Amino acid sequence: MIDVHVHLAALPDGENGCYISAKMLRRPLARFLAWKYKLDFGKPAEANAFYIERLLRELERSAQVKKVVLLGMDGVYDAAGSLDKTRTDFLISNDYVLQVARSRPDRFLAGVSVNPQRRDALEELERAAAEGAALVKVLPNAQCFDPADGRYRPFYRALARLKLPLLSHVGYEFSLAGRDQSAGDPARLRNALDEGVTVIGAHGCSQGLFAYEPHVKTVREFVHRYPHFYLDASALTLPNRVGMLFILKRHPEIQQRLIFGTDYPLPVLAYPALGRRYLEAARASYFDRQAVVLKNLGISCRDFAAVTP
């Protein structure tokens, strides 16, 4: 099985095209990653290699997941389409994503990130497709663009023509500085769907605000209207998103569009599994724990390989 939602983290080493702001290095997520993975921010090349080695070890331990989509992260772009580093928390370059994916094609697929606001967005899509990208990932809340803006229809048409799925963050964004949280509303992905793009709403289209889940009506409409609309299961064991797991349990028609994903390196928690399954989940490897929790709740997932256009 493929995990469709795995983040590629990297520090800038002078060659990989990545960027991270001083502010981002002080944020809880960066401190958590440094602690959990024993990363030395003063030795970027070593830290980057160790992150990949750790991910490969987790994949070796998994009986369920054999390949993952590595996700990049584009930056914020100004009105002229130029990169605005003053508003960019971090950037994981497509060059780096493609390079790492090529290094282990048996384990990694490339999930590039292209902000449609960038001046060369269409050219970058063409390049990524030619170099074997599996999908395009966006995080509108932090990348400061509105997915519903009509100016991006040519971008969506290019995605459809190139048969590149669009994996879009849904809900509130806490790990980065979410500047416009309304951009995480899945209803804003309608233009992409109307243009024929295979759209995957991240995190089960949950809002990320604990019990408040306002997007269920939109999700049910999209499932009924668009055969090329999907959701992924990433981050759904986290307390602020777990409510959507129990909603999915009650809606088998939505489950039919659910794709397996975790949101690595964020934690996968065992507590939604009940009874003896809890112990099984708690003892399982990282990727298998997600599979055990979902199975315990009677939630089935599709494999990303089966839904690519």
Predicted regions mapped to residue ranges:
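Active-site environment of divalent metal-dependent phosphoester hydrolases
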Residues: 7-11, 75-78, 116-120, 143, ...
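Short, flexible/disordered intra-domain loops and linkers
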Residues: 18-20, 39-45, 77-89, 175-183, ...
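H/E-rich (His + Asp/Glu) clusters that bind or coordinate divalent metals
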Residues: 205-309
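Distinct, well-ordered alpha-helical segments
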Residues: 119-129, 147-152, 177-193, 209-223, ...
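Hydrophobic faces of well-ordered beta-strands that scaffold small-molecule active sites
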Residues: 2-6, 68-71, 108-112, 136-138, ...
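Active-site gating/metal-coordination segments in enzymes
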Residues: 73-181
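An N-terminally biased module of ancient metal coordination in phosphate/nucleic-acid-related enzymes
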Residues: 1-71, 77-88, 305
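Short, well-ordered coil/turn segments that N-cap beta-strands
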Residues: 63-67, 104-109, 131-134, 162-164, ...
